[in-house]
Regions:
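Hydrophobic targeting/anchoring helices
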Residues: 124-126, 130
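Structural recognition of the beta-strand scaffold that forms the well-ordered cores
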Residues: 13-15, 42-45, 100-102, 129, ...
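An active-site-proximal structural segment forming one wall of the substrate-binding cleft
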Residues: 1-9
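Carbohydrate-interacting/catalytic domains
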Residues: 137, 141-275
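Active-site clefts of carbohydrate-active enzymes
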Residues: 95-116
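Active-site-proximal helices and loops of the catalytic beta/alpha 8
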Residues: 7, 17-95, 99, 118, ...
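Short catalytic-loop micro-motif centered on adjacent basic/acidic residues
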Residues: 13-19, 111-112
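A structural motif
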Residues: 11, 61, 133-134
Length: 275
């Protein structure tokens, strides 16, 4: 069947539903066979819980759904507890960069409905798009669409949206996600860069993604009020560029970067090392 789809439609990968119940030997054989069809053919599986490393390895799947991070993100913001997110990232550090990350999908209540504070949508997506993993945006998420499943129906999670409505649905979140997508595409640190925790409290969180001679630092604030963060910078550098604020320059003094974050917001900062 996979060979038919490759030969007929030139597909580059497949998503395996309920991969947690598939036979491991079958997945190993599938990996071997698809590699002969296309060297870079991608296999991604839906796995709700368990040791993700059992599925994600050189012999089976390239990626699985990171439901653990999904839960940590919405509850970490709702409970003002960034420790939950940071703990999850540390625990999955060995394979986290290969996992498929999300805050919405076709089986889960919309993140805009799960969050108690709707203003958290901006830092939630800033977090998703810069933490280790392969981030995804479920359609409608870019407009902050709400939706909850019921015991008998999931239709609210999958509304029909006319292209004629796109312009009227556009909002601040739409522009933020668009900018985050460009940032993710253009900065290799966010692809497979090493993660390093820099600052952590219940309501503020900063982490770095390492490149060879550069860093991306993400700073997040889940408090309603603005917060001043003094972030240690693990690289010799004199300034940082705020990628979400049209290239605003921030000085680095004595190895620390000071930034003021608005309530319920975040920043993505690019730092290039000094030779």
């Amino acid at each position: 069947m996979i060979r038919f789809w490759v030969d007929t439609f030139d597909i580059d990968g497949i998503r395996l539903d309920c991969a947690n119940v598939l036979d491991f030997h079958f997945m190993e054989e599938m990996r071997r066979e698809t590699k002969t069809m296309k060297e870079d053919f991608w296999l991604m599986g839906e796995v709700i819980h368990g040791d993700y490393g059992r599925w994600v390895n050189d012999h089976m799947l390239h990626s699985v759904t990171n439901y653990e991070l999904h839960k940590s993100i919405y509850s970490g913001f709702n409970d003002h507890n960034f420790f939950e997110i940071a703990h999850n990232v540390r625990r999955l550090e060995a394979i986290g960069r290969s996992l498929y990350t999300f805050v919405d999908n076709h089986d889960e209540d919309r993140i805009a409905s799960k969050l108690r504070t709707k203003e958290h949508l901006l830092p939630v997506y800033t977090c998703l798009m810069t933490l280790p993993g392969i981030p995804s945006i479920y359609y409608g998420g870019e407009w902050g669409i709400e939706g909850k499943r019921t015991p008998s129906c999931d239709d609210a999670l999958r509304p029909a949206i006319s292209p004629d409505a796109f312009d009227s649905l556009r909002c601040t979140l739409t522009d933020r996600i668009s900018k985050l997508g460009i940032i993710h595409q253009e900065n290799e640190e966010l692809h497979m860069g090493r993660y390093q925790e820099l600052l952590l409290t219940n309501r503020q969180y900063a982490f770095a993604r390492h490149g060879e001679h550069s860093l991306i630092i993400t700073a997040l604030n889940n408090d309603d009020n603005e917060a001043v963060l003094n972030i240690p910078v693990p690289m010799a550098a004199s300034q940082a560029v705020n990628l979400l604020e049209d290239g605003e320059i921030l000085p680095i003094r004595d190895g620390k970067l000071q930034i003021t974050l608005k309530g319920c917001d975040g920043a993505v900062l690019k730092i290039k090392g000094e030779s």
